[in-house]
Amino acid sequence: EVGDIPMAPRERRQWGERLGEISQRWDAGDLDLRELHLELAALLRGFAEARSGEEITTATVSEILDMAATAGPSSVEERRRSVRAAGRPLDINPLGHVGELLAVWEQPSFDREPQAAGQEALTHAREVVTRW
């Protein structure tokens, strides 16, 4: 079972500051949607590793989903399909939620309006950093 390591307020603030820097670069037009997703994915992988104590930064999305307890389908592939169809994470388990966000961000974003998709990605990342 994956741990849930408490995080000091100062450390959580540092993760929030990193997220703020990414958000500023997005707002300034320095990142396209793909670059934003890659930066947010790296940030959330590091955050999830700090919270879980598990090697998340190098794990695949499938490995992350496999190690996270879930209230949803037990099959990783079924979870990926459900999340991609919904276009958003469905799991209430924090690590599962991160894994599902990564799965959504892996998908090509040609069918989404980039500005709205970017703001949605930032909102989801902010929720993880402030609530987990």
Task: Name each model feature, range by range.
Residues 1-25, 130-132:
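Hydrophobic, helix-length membrane anchors
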Residues 24-132:
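Membrane-proximal, non-transmembrane interaction modules
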